[in-house]
Amino acid sequence: MKKRVFSALLALVLTLSAVVLPASAAGSFSDVSDKKTAQNVEVLRLLGVVEGNGIGQFNPYAQLTRAEFCKMLVTLMGSSDVLRYKTVTIFRDVRASHWAARYVNYAVRGEKLLAGLPDGTFQPDRAISYGEAVTILMRLLRTDADAASGGIWPEGYIDLAKASGVSAGVELAGGAAISRAQAAQLFVNVLGAKATSSSTDKDGETSTTTRVYNPANCVSRERVTLIALNGNTARVSGGKKNSYDLVRPSSATVLNGLKGDLLLDADGKVLTFVPVVS
């Protein structure tokens, strides 16, 4: 009898906790109240793509600049090659001393995902447009993006983004500025999208490879149901193990109970968890 009463009380406590818990408390940032945004932001925070402003806020509705977008992009890519670009000056308004120089330089010269302006500037503090953002992301995912777009900018790239699922949950005019929350949605979509690369052999034969996009530092994925993030550990069900070490600690609850992919590094540690879109 006592055990039944205790179980009932425990269930009641858990239910009440779930009801009264504010949405912002479920994630890592106090100013993110939308559940979907909180999930996206936590996926990216685990990966190191977003950090907040140092006082526990993400500023989800603030416009994203071109420099900030490059930092998010390159961090998501997970390549250590970015370090080689931190002392380089390509644009006169992004000197080597600029906080985003390595990210801008790598995205422009290392990966050729975007370019500067005809006057030799990059305009790092200008708000990035939706058209610019999806163009960059489609170039990341497809080596033939420029050809596949039909040379129509930005409509051709926007159509590619829709077809690939990269723009799911975000619908804007090409010239519209994007918010930090909208950018988070785009980047999480990329982590679940297919990447296509084409190559030509010595005989002139072209082959195409398609796979789910992974950051460079991700060596494998594992489909699991996330039970909880407890500090430095992720507890899961349905995986090869019941728990995994996290690269970055988290106690956020917003991803709990979701099915998705653990992205694992070479040491078997969790870079992030990407929910599966049903």
Task: Give the label of every model feature segment.
Residues K2-A38, E51-R102, R109-A177, V190-A252, ...:
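Feature responds to low-complexity, polar/acidic, surface-exposed segments characteristic
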Residues L44, Y106-A107:
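PEST-like intrinsically disordered low-complexity regions enriched in serine, proline, threonine
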